[in-house]
Amino acid sequence: MVTGIFLPPRNSWRFLALAVVAAVLAGCTTAPYTGRQQVLMVSPEREQALGYQAFSQIERTSRQAQDPALRARVREVGERIAKAADRPDYHWEFVVFQDDKTANAFCLPGGKVGVYTGLFKYIKSDDDLATVLSHEVAHALARHAGERLSQGRLAQAGGLALNVGLAALGVPSVASQAAMQGYGLGSQVGILLPYSRVQESEADRIGLILMAKAGYDPEKALGFWERFATAKKDKAQPPQFLSTHPTDAARIQSIRAFLPEARQYYTAR
């Protein structure tokens, strides 16, 4: 009885390479609004389940804000953004977490959105709040979390194929280890980080469209990001090629370029 397939060592790396290519082709899809080609090897259902699981853990370990007016404000603006996103399959939820030292927000797969109270020192209007929420919702709408998971899987598969290929070629172990270490650094800087910057820029672009569709002025987004950049300019930033986010100057320049597109969707509420 045949229990498996034997691949000669010199051919196994070719098989792995073909398997990686096949997986990439099978997972090709297109991001909304931008039309960017993506590779997604995670199902929407699995991605959303991971998002719900992560959100439950955050709720267990974080304290929610008790200010009813603040919670209602975030929920009202968030629901307008969610309506513009047009994903009725998402279980939208907008929660404010009490942490005045954290100026951050997130949207997990499936529509679970969190905003930390520390962010409100920079938010001067509902348009500012819509800027933040629409950016985070855009990450979920474009399935950036699933894309990142897929990139990690592809990087692992590429490393395995390289390891098998080096062994098949009889490369000495010391040289093989050096090559693998170089591959790890190269995949991080050359593949994973740049994609993260692409996703951030894409979330800015889609976010402007979403806030415009929801009736918030996309022009105000520029002022918010400029103000936010000024407030944190004293904090050291890594070089852009080592950062998961674009530099503040690059982000603001991109937003200026995206605004004409977003204006086409804007009707004042």
Locations of the language-model features?
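A Zn2+-metalloprotease active-site environment signal
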Residues: 15-16, 28-269
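C-terminal motif of bacterial Sec signal peptides marking the signal peptidase cleavage site
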Residues: 23-27
